[in-house]
Design a protein with these regions (language model features):
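Hydrophobic anchor at the beta1->P-loop junction of P-loop NTPases
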Residues: 30-32
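Walker A (P-loop) phosphate-binding loop of P-loop NTPases
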Residues: 37
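Phosphate-binding P-loop
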Residues: 21-27
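Short phosphate-coordinating micro-motif centered on Lys-Gly-acidic
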Residues: 3, 86, 92-163
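Conserved nucleotide-sensing/catalytic segment adjacent to the nucleotide-binding pocket
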Residues: 56, 61, 67-110
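N-terminal pre-Walker A segment at the start of P-loop NTPase domains
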Residues: 1-19
Length: 163
């Protein structure tokens, strides 16, 4: 079961991220896919706001991983744009989602299509430009809890604070 939403502007994409950040549980891995400028970082900034992280959320394009631990849950923001194939294996990302070396939190992976193997039960988020809106966001859950979360998600719910 997937759900697709049309986001009328960047604020709506941010609001979707905030809505998710307020509801996600520790150990959630978000696999974000989409072209340049599709809104992956904007969505992650909203997630940070929803997690009550006071720090500015920046794209880790050059650092590869940014860690934020001052919110309701830690946020591990990963950007695989500059990596290819086996290079992502060397980041040992499983140490983030397994909660062994790092406290369990939210792992948000941009350019997740570059991963060679997927974590268990990720929430897949595909972002794309759309002719009738700024972007289209499709969420595909892989666990019962994520399915409940996605079912509860409506454009009206996330845009309520924008009106």
């Amino acid at each position: 079961m997937s759900k697709t939403l049309l986001m009328p502007n960047d604020r709506a994409t941010f609001a979707l991220g905030q809505w998710l950040g307020e509801r996600l549980v520790a150990g959630t891995v978000l696999l974000m896919m989409g072209d340049l400028g599709a809104g992956k970082t904007t969505l992650t900034k909203g997630i940070g706001r929803g997690l009550n992280i006071p720090d500015e959320i920046d794209s880790p394009t050059f650092t590869l991983i940014n860690e934020y631990d001052s919110g309701r849950l830690p946020l591990y923001h990963v950007d695989l744009y500059r990596l290819e194939g086996a290079e992502s294996d060397r980041l040992f990302l499983e140490s983030y989602w397994e909660g062994i070396e790092y406290p369990p939190g939210i792992v948000a992976i941009e350019w997740a299509e570059r991963l060679r193997y997927l974590p268990p039960e990720p929430l897949k988020i595909a972002l794309a430009h759309h002719p009738k809106a700024v972007r289209q966001v499709t969420l595909t859950p892989s666990s019962p809890a994520q399915t409940c979360l996605v079912k509860a998600l409506t454009t009206d719910a996330i845009l309520a604070d924008e009106i």
